[in-house]
Amino acid sequence: MLTWDQENATTAPMPNNMDAATPHQVPTSASQAAPSASATGATATTTSAYSMSAPSTGRVKASDKRIINGKTDVNQLVPFKYKWAWEKYLASCANHWMPQEVNMTRDIALWKDPNGLTDDERRLVKRNLGFFVTADSLAANNIVLGSYRHITAPECRQFLLRQAFEEAIHTHAYQYIVESLGLDESEIFNAYNEVESIRAKDQFLIPYIEILCDPTFKTGTIETDQALLKSLIVFACLMEGMFFYVGFTQILALGRQNKMTGAAEQYQYILRDESMHCNFGIDVINQIKLENPALWTAEFKDEIRALFLEAVELEYRYAEDTMPRGVLGLNASMFKGYLRYIANRRAQQIGLDPLFASEENPFPWMSEMIDLKKERNFFETRVIEYQTGGALSWD
């Protein structure tokens, strides 16, 4: 089972003696294995992108590739240098799913039943969807309009294309839930303009999309490369790695109580996808640090820590807004410890010290939800290893 301590799913060692899923193989050239935070400190000896002079035409050498500021032909996928990116792409393809294959009949009946859910549970569902229906569109915009054009490793671009498609599937899933339940579409889809706790999170994210989407923005200097790196950290560690987890926990908690099981099943698939996106983003971040150690300055790390602290506060306010009273055996204060736990994990994964005193995961069952590589029946839907190699099976 993929656990929080194995969440990177790479062959790289985890910091602070957190073991990865498999033993680390030391690469023979410029990190062919996925990079770890501990391998990307200021003492890295890999050639900096600023002094790199790789050929721009002709046959590509794997050793000449760079994540950013590369000079090799981005249209030539092989030879691979970053095999971890290709492996994640293949794993994501194997986990393909579509929302309409999930049965929503029980959810519809429960939602229509006046006594099916409490008012607090209904508020939670609507606030939850209010954030997610547009969040994945923001993530997709960040990829297709921003970060994709600044990444110069074609195997990483290949994953980004798959990731953008999955963001579209997630938006489709939330729309499918909204439509199935007969919710007011304009209320839910415009929540990011009308609900302050949702709006605050989105306004935190938007500047990091806009800078990369600016057609005049180009990497190649310390300042612009740090701007790109900061945006990648915000989206991998804070959006996909933190801002989604209150919502995931809430809907999956409903599913654990045999409520809204169709929605919970889709959220479980989305959680699995987003865990892969987060891990890929962290690998890219660490590889950029390895290839460009001059970016990882003390001042820059202080800026990243400040962003982490702000994100924890924003997500905690969202938790308070979605559940002002205790519901489902959860309450907002429980999420304070959870968010600090996640923030510490993300910080360590990119080579920062923990931001908070030792925090434990108050929801260990969430670790089980990340992995679907086995027969499992969490929500009475009898899902059997949903992969394209074996179609979704309903008993």
Region spans (language model):
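Amphipathic alpha-helical packing elements
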Residues: Y50-W111
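Non-heme di-metal
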Residues: D119-D395
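N-terminal intrinsically disordered, low-complexity tails
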Residues: M1, D5-A44
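Asp/Glu-centered strand-loop micro-motifs enriched in Gly/Pro and often flanked by an aromatic residue
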Residues: P55-A62, N75-Q76, T105-T134, G146-R149
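Membrane-interacting alpha-helical segments
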Residues: A37-T57, E121-R123
